[in-house]
Amino acid sequence: MTDTLDLDRAVATLTQGGVIAYPTEAVWGLGCDPRQEAAVLRLLEIKRRPVEKGVIVVASSVDLLRDWVDIDALEPARRQDVLASWPGPHTWILPVTARAPRWVTGEHDGLAVRISAHPVVAALCAAWGAPLVSTSANLAGEPPARSRAALDPALLATIDGVVDGETGALAQPTQIRDARSGQILRD
């Protein structure tokens, strides 16, 4: 059985390169330290997701993302739209800086980021104090889990712990919109 982690143990697990599961706005997510290449590659291997696709990164504030994204490169109106939507269930593709790691961006010139208002995600990000990978807790091509009970036992056997809680009220995973063009990539 996978351990249930309080916030302190979750932070310790992330620091050690671990992969954890936690509830998000609509589905359960998998997370790890995006600054640790080995942790991200392990998470992607668990999901059977190609590194080329990139991952979503969540944080407790925009300032924690500034090393990797250049929000100031956006047109002022688009930048205002992004900032006004956070914290909240809005994932935006932002232009990346040269420091954004390829194991996070994949083959893209943007990075999907969110400042979440979900209580568990917000508390985890605040306690962690750094960006966190947030990708659905399922194998690639399988439906995402909407409850802890729905998490795949085989997936649970490969991760390092679970932060308990309930998913939010969204019926679908968060919309993903490119902040540069306004194009909706996932609705």
Curated annotation (Swiss-Prot):
Q: What class of enzyme is it?
A: transferase
* GO terms for biological process, alphabetical: regulation of translational fidelity; tRNA threonylcarbamoyladenosine modification
Specify the protein name.
Threonylcarbamoyl-AMP synthase
Q: Name one GO cellular component term.
A: cytoplasm
The protein's GO terms of the molecular function aspect are: ATP binding; double-stranded RNA binding; L-threonylcarbamoyladenylate synthase; tRNA binding
Which key words are in the record? ATP-binding, Cytoplasm, Nucleotide-binding, Nucleotidyltransferase, Transferase, tRNA processing
Keyword check for Transport: no
Primary residence = cytoplasm
Q: Which SUPFAM superfamilies match?
A: YrdC/RibB (SSF55821)
Per the UniProt entry, the Enzyme Commission number(s) are: 2.7.7.87
Highest taxon of source: Bacteria
Which family would the database say this protein is a member of?
A: Belongs to the SUA5 family. TsaC subfamily.
Source organism (scientific name): Xanthomonas euvesicatoria pv. vesicatoria (strain 85-10) (Xanthomonas campestris pv. vesicatoria)
Q: Which HAMAP family match?
A: TsaC
